[in-house]
Every structure is written in C-alpha cells, then in structure tokens.
Amino acid sequence: MGGGRGTRLYPLTKERCKPAVPLAGKYRLVDIPISNCLNSGINRIFLLTQFNTASLHRHVQNTYHFDSFGQGFVDIMAAEQTEKYADWYQGTADAVRRNVVHFRTHPHDYVLILSGDQLYRMDFRKVIAQHIATGADVTIAAQPVPVSKIEDLGAMRVDDNLEIKQFAEKPKDAALIDSLAMSPALEARLTTGSTGKRCLASMGIYVFSRGVLQQALDNSMRDFGKEVIPSLLGRKRLFAYIFEGYWVDIGTVRAFFEANLALAEPVPRFNFYMHTTPIYTHARFLPATKINRCTIDNAVIGDGSIITDCTLKHCVIGIRAMVRDGSHLEDVVMMGADFYESEEELKEHAARGLPSVGVGRGCNIRGSIIDKNARIGDGVVLSPEGKPPNGEYPYDVLIRDGVLVVPKGAVIPPGTKI
C-alpha cells in the first residue's frame, strides 16, 4: 500500500508520498516491504499509489527489474478513473477493491497486504505457513506492545490457538483496553519478557485467502482496520501471527527521526548488514565517501559524500551530502542531495549569494532533519531546544513533534539562528 497523504510526516511528504521518503542514508521506505517480499520468495508485487507519486514511481522503475523469462514484477497501480470509479481511493480496503481485477489475471491462492511506511524484517513464508496450517481465512501479523501505546494501533484478543476473538481499532476506553490485554498464558509463550500488561497490536500486515478477500470487499467498506476486519470477526476464521522482532511504524516526524538515529547506534536493533536478507535499493554507482580531518561518533554516512573538518555525533548522513569546515552536527538526519554542483554552478551561485547545497562552514545543527537539496549557509545555528514542539519559522523551517525540519530544497542564509 502506497499510503495516503502522509500529513503527520509533513513537510517530508510535501513533494513525495510516505513510501518515497529517504531512509538510512541511501534507501527509501518502500524498499523495506519489497525487499521482505523478495527475500521471502514473493516476486509478484502490486504497489498501490495515489498522492505525490512521481518520485516513488521513478525509484521503483529504476530499481526493481526482473529478467524477461521469469514471472516476477513490481507493478505500480496508480489511482485511476474508470467507468465504475471516478474518484480517489477512499481508504486501504477501497484501494485493494479497485485493483482486484488486476490480481485475478495471475494465479494465486493467497494475497499478502502490506503497508509502505514501516521498518521491520519478516519472513512472510512463516506467516503464510501458519495461515495454511490453522485453516485461517485471514491472518494478521501482530506485535506485543505495552497497553500505554495501544491507543494509536489496532488491538486484538486471541485464544490459546491464536484465533482472534476480539478486535478494536485505536481503543481509547480503559476498560476496553484492559479486556484486550494478553493473558498470562500467552505472555508465558513469548520470548520477549515484560514487566507490565501488553496487548497484541495489529501491524497492518494481512494474509487473505483469495475467496475471502473477494467476499470481504464485496461492499463499500473503505478501511481494513476500522471496518473490514471487525466485520469478519465471528463470521470467518481470523488468526494472529505473533511477531516479536523489531518493528516500527514510521507515521510521524518524531518516529521517522528516532528510527533513523537508532540505526547509528553501535548495535542497532534493525540490521542493514545481514547478507542473507539484504535490503535492496537503486544502484546509483556513486564514489566512496571522502572524510577529511573529522571527528565522528556513531554515524551512518551514505555514498558519494564529502565531509570535511567537522564533527558528526549520532547522525545519519545521506548520499552526495556536503558538510563543510568547522561545522558540528549532533542528532541530525541529513538526507543528502540528488545531484552534485559543478564548478561553474558553484561560482555562479556564490556570485548571487546563494549557499551551496549541503551544510556550510561553521554551522551548529542539533536535533534536526535536513531534507534533500537543502542549502545551509555559513554560520547557521539550528536547534529545536527551548522551542514549542510544533511551530513555523523563517525560510520554511518547521518544528514538528519536537524535531526541527529543513524542507527539501530550502535555502537558509548565512548567519541564520533558529
């Protein structure tokens, strides 16, 4: 699923959809579900898209090529007007409903439905194997989470066989949440211990038997979590697949910021360095990163960057990034650039007083996200410290969820202090 407008990730989604947002220096969010599919032996993939999709389409088309003699594909299914439908997708279920006609042209018994804005590594073969073994009509991947965090997720109660007996989307009532808490017997079966009550949270990952999906969508329901799943409860066999590995829903600026910075830890919970289950992305053929006279502590730096005489502490730096002399970056996610500036362009921009792409000399930047192609002049100071958690500032700078964000292509003049 390509996702909706991504308003909670704004301004990162101002010019792109959520799955196209850069991740971990060189990837995009959409690479995660596609790579999980490919590593699980699933290579017939439909990507349903709608808002700000140009960069997503370009990335997928440039990245996922299959040989002419195989049956694998990643097909982009953009929202379209037809004789039957004249408007946009109205939700996750509606998006799938409108594309079922395309699924039918490929032989299949099961349909796996995924979100495009999550970070995790999962072997979907295990989910499908459990789905078959239990005789399930629908299997929902679920993760144990503290009851204090369940209000923003779908919650389910299961019996000893993991059959779902109760489901609530984003429950608020304390009594309802308490009724959804995992039983001591189920807690004892898990490998991850807990000091408090937990609920099983829906990960937004579904396996449907083919006929059941068609029946479930033979109506006007728009959303899987809010409508379709509750409507099937008691009528079909719904089971949970419990996943105890690392999983994060990157739905907000804060979640995106923290998920990226977590990758800079010495031993991150999500490991991009697993050769057996790699995360695939576009091969850009960039040169190695050049680092000159720098102090670097816990950082991830993308290909083709030039980092000179500066300090990086707990940072994720993207491709083609330029960080210049005397600058200090701490707790910063910098997405890099789509291009290099030529010598002629650098001279022309300097004559016009336009800062070069990247971070200038003598800057001090903390707690920030710097989107692609931003131009930050010399002596700029940026930090969300001491400011409200949400606010608007000069040069299109925003603070969202306590994180300062420099939007894509923004120009921050020399000496600016925010």
Predicted regions and their residues:
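Left-handed beta-helix
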Residues: 185-196, 210-418
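Unchanged
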Residues: 1-267, 354-355, 390-403, 407-409, ...
